[in-house]
UniProtKB/Swiss-Prot annotation:
Keyword Hydrolase attached: no
UniProt name for this protein: Short neurotoxin 3
Classification via CDD domains: TFP_snake_toxin
Record bears the keyword Disulfide bond: yes
Gene3D superfamilies membership: CD59 (2.10.60.10)
Task performed by this protein: Binds with high affinity to muscle nicotinic acetylcholine receptor (nAChR) and hinders acetylcholine binding to the receptor, thereby impairing neuromuscular transmission. Competes with the binding of alpha-bungarotoxin on muscle AChR (from Torpedo) with an IC(50) of 0.30 uM. Causes muscle paralysis, spasms and increased respiration.
Residues spanning the signal sequence: 1-21
InterPro entries: Snake_3FTx (IPR003571), Snake_toxin-like_sf (IPR045860)
Species annotation: Pseudonaja textilis (Eastern brown snake)
Length: 79
């Protein structure tokens, strides 16, 4: 009985994500699982040609500079 209980506990631990990991957008549709020390999703605009701007997205440890930065700390919040 103890062996069965121990086995169930081990399977549960292996299947669950016990350490919370943040997921952010890296591109328009691509996502990335952040490293444990990266606790912020960011988005900012990178100037491009002809007055256009390209959004840069990803994970970080702090809010980066740039044009119109958006920083947040929940999954997929940097759309």
């Amino acid at each position: 009985m103890k062996t069965l209980l121990l086995t169930l506990v081990m399977v549960t631990i292996m299947c669950l994500d016990l350490g919370y990991t943040l997921t952010c957008y890296k591109g328009y549709h691509d996502t990335v699982v952040c490293k444990p020390h990266e606790t912020i999703c960011y988005r900012y605009l990178v100037p491009a040609t002809h007055g256009n701007a390209i959004p840069a997205r990803g994970c970080g440890t702090s809010c980066p500079g740039g044009n119109h930065p958006v920083c947040c700390s929940t999954d997929l919040c940097n759309k």
